[in-house]
Swiss-Prot record:
Lineage: Viruses, Duplodnaviria, Heunggongvirae, Peploviricota, Herviviricetes
Organism the protein comes from: Human cytomegalovirus (strain Merlin)
Cysteines joined through disulfide linkages: 69-151
Compartments reported by the entry: Host endoplasmic reticulum membrane; Host Golgi apparatus membrane
Residues passing through the membrane, by range: 179-199
Residues glycosylated per entry: 61
GO cellular component: host cell endoplasmic reticulum membrane; host cell Golgi membrane; membrane
Domain Ig-like H-type: from-to ranges: 61-155
Protein name (database record): Membrane glycoprotein US8
Main location as per UniProt: host cell
Bilayer topology term: Single-pass type I membrane protein
Keyword field: Disulfide bond, Glycoprotein, Host endoplasmic reticulum, Host Golgi apparatus, Host membrane, Immunoglobulin domain, Membrane, Signal, Transmembrane, Transmembrane helix
InterPro entries found in the cross-reference section: CMV_US
Length: 227
């Protein structure tokens, strides 16, 4: 019994470690970390630093973008200017998501206003945002004819908008790569299956012992009953 308890405790520790594992990727161009003055988490007013330009791989139709945002009294005023090749007649779907508390909380904001041209698209959003917001993500889907559930975002434009002090930013803002996320999910699923196997085996042994004790026909009992 002690061996199974130790195994369960070890599995729980591994689960907690994987759940809280962070991957800062400090050199990732997707994120812009503040380097001015430290700020407390959840302050209602925030003015983003000057917009920076980001480059995308040549395979994407989106080449670069600039972003700026201001959070005042808990209200976000953000603008994304995206350069690339667009087809206004085919339409484009834009979604804005937010994440906070090391990825433990996330959600989706209102759809931004879109002004799409052949070489540039401008997206504006003004909405109340939660106090524990860390960064925003603009998802662009270059079609509107297909159903939304089949329309997966093709371009992900991220812009840091709101957060903690500089020391916490490298710990808070991270993103799993697809391979690493797959490995983590596979390990967690394996631990779930192993835990289910251990529980099922324990239940089977307990039920078997109970049945043999109270319901099985033991030879001595059968002989006495026949007598």
């Amino acid at each position: 019994m002690r061996r199974w308890l130790r195994l369960l405790v070890g599995l729980g520790c591994c689960w907690v470690t994987l759940a809280h594992a962070g991957n800062p990727y400090e050199d990732d161009d997707y994120y812009y970390y503040r380097e001015d003055e430290p700020r407390q988490h959840g302050e209602p007013n925030y003015v983003a630093p000057p917009a920076r330009q980001f480059r995308f791989p040549p395979l994407n139709n989106v080449s670069s973008y600039q972003a700026s945002c201001v959070v005042k009294d808990g209200v976000l005023d953000a603008v994304w200017r995206v350069q690339g090749t667009f087809y206004p007649e085919k339409g484009i779907v834009a979604r804005v998501g937010w994440s906070g508390r090391r990825g433990r909380k996330w959600g989706r904001l209102h759809a931004p206003e879109c002004l799409v041209e052949t070489t540039e698209a401008v997206f504006r959003l003004r909405q109340w945002v939660p106090t524990d917001l860390d960064h925003l993500t603009l998802h662009l889907v270059p079609c509107t004819k297909c159903k939304p559930m089949w329309c997966q975002p093709r371009y992900h434009i991220r812009y840091f908008s709101y957060g903690n002090s500089v020391d916490n930013l490298r710990r808070l803002h991270y993103e799993y790569r697809h391979l690493e996320l797959g490995v983590v999910i596979a390990i967690q699923m394996a631990m779930v299956l192993l835990l289910g196997y251990v529980l099922a085996r324990t239940v089977y042994r307990v039920s078997s012992a109970y049945y043999l004790r109270w319901h099985a026909c033991v030879p001595q009992k059968c002989e006495k009953s026949l007598c």
